[in-house]
Amino acid sequence: MHTVTPIPAFNDNYIWLIHAKDSGGHYVVDPGDAKAVLDYLEQHQIVLDGILITHHHSDHTGGIAELQASHDHKLTVYGPDNENIKGINHPISGQTESVKPEKLDSDAAVFHLPGHTLGHIAYLIDDHLFCGDTLFSAGCGRLFEGTPAQMHHSLQTLAQLDETTLVYPAHEYTQANLAFALTVENDNEALIAHAAKVKQLRDQNLPSLPSSIGLEKQINPFLRPEQASIKQNLSCHFAQDVTDDGTSFTLLRQWKDNFL
């Protein structure tokens, strides 16, 4: 059994702290800001055991060196082996399907999710999915390196997980994503209801996360590019006939990239 706590960092990052109830271990996911982590550890008298990295962007990796230095270089650091990330001492290859982090209570299933970056991975520990910048609540990551087809496939992989799976993205982007999703689907009742709930949370400066796979399948247009109503709205917006799922996903991402 594991519990998960958000450590806010920068303007909108979450560094997720995983606590293993039985083994007593603690890992952080994507610690871009060492100070935020160290302050939290000190405040709560927690000893850190390791780090899980999803991809190479500095707001996810920038704290590795300082965290290692503050722990006598004894931290276990997992991450993709093909993203040139300094500080990883347990590299994960493209063939790896799971890892067993010491002092966690369960193995971590590994998902290879090219799109946001080519080597992006996610970790599933029990029913907790740490998906970095691939899947956001009501959205998905920008395509800095991969293709729309790769991201579409990566998201469809995650959509196959159990609907009760909890989703822990690395950013508090939910309200902005919901604004776009409501533009695409202004009659989606689940989306309208969730937007109201998220507004209440954010008005109190509370996280909108975690989400769940089941919820995302209802509110996230990037998980449903095949839906006829989404294709129809895309056809109207882009003044072209949108029939296949791949084109639908590509145009959704293009629309979001330019959405204000």
From Swiss-Prot:
GO terms for molecular function: hydroxyacylglutathione hydrolase activity; metal ion binding. GO terms for biological process: methylglyoxal catabolic process to D-lactate via S-lactoyl-glutathione. Its cofactor is Zn(2+). Its EC number is 3.1.2.6. Keywords: Hydrolase, Metal-binding, Zinc. Zn(2+) 2 binds at residues 59-60, 133, 171. Pathway: Secondary metabolite metabolism; methylglyoxal degradation; (R)-lactate from methylglyoxal: step 2/2. Disulfide bonds: none annotated. Zn(2+) 1 binds at residues 55, 57, 116, 133. Binds 2 Zn(2+) ions per subunit. SMART domains: Lactamase_B (SM00849). It catalyses: an S-(2-hydroxyacyl)glutathione + H2O = a 2-hydroxy carboxylate + glutathione + H(+). Monomer. Thiolesterase that catalyzes the hydrolysis of S-D-lactoyl-glutathione to form glutathione and D-lactic acid. Belongs to the metallo-beta-lactamase superfamily. Glyoxalase II family. This is Hydroxyacylglutathione hydrolase. It comes from Shewanella loihica (strain ATCC BAA-1088 / PV-4). The gene is gloB.
